[in-house]
């Protein structure tokens, strides 16, 4: 199973073959704001691709536009991906996270999802391009991720380095 954002730049011929699997709302920010999570499925060559659908985050551009303020989009995607697995009642043995955009997944697994089926999964993080490291201000990460204060200490932010008041997610 592969989980991806449903960007509008995905060619129409693939969009037309996606099937609706369900939707729900989840809290995201530290203020508890609720966001829509839609799940669209596409299958090819025996592989199931689940696309996380939310026009607020994925309706414009492509994965490489607007890199400056991507933290809201990828906090949403990381948490929505795990919430979708719970919604679909599918528990992986290992969650493979790729690049900084998914680097919060292991933290979410051990905090927000620790008492769920998906919270039992292990996680591995791979890196494709070290140029993009997801460096953001702590307040911005904390607001959008909704992660508690204790996560932002050097012993808990596994893999996330503190650099001059900002955090590097890789």
Task: Describe each region flagged by the PLM.
Residues 1-170:
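Catalytic cores of nucleotide-sugar-dependent glycosyltransferases that transfer UDP/GDP/TDP-activated
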């Amino acid at each position: 199973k592969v989980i991806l954002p449903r960007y509008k730049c995905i060619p129409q011929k693939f969009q037309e073959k996606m099937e609706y699997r369900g939707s729900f709302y989840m809290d995201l920010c530290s203020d508890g704001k609720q966001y829509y999570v839609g799940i669209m499925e596409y299958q090819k060559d025996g592989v199931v691709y689940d696309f996380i659908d939310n026009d607020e985050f994925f309706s414009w551009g492509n994965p490489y536009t607007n890199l400056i303020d991507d933290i809201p989009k990828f906090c949403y995607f990381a948490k929505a991906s795990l919430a979708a697995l719970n919604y679909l009642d599918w528990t992986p043995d290992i969650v493979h996270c790729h690049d900084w955009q998914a680097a919060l997944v292991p933290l979410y697994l051990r905090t927000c999802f620790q008492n769920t089926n998906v919270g039992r999964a292990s996680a591995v993080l791979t890196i494709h391009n070290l140029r993009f490291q997801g460096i953001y201000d702590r307040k911005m990460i904390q607001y959008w991720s909704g992660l508690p204060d204790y996560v932002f200490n050097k012993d808990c932010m596994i893999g996330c380095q503190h650099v001059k008041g900002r955090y590097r997610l890789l």
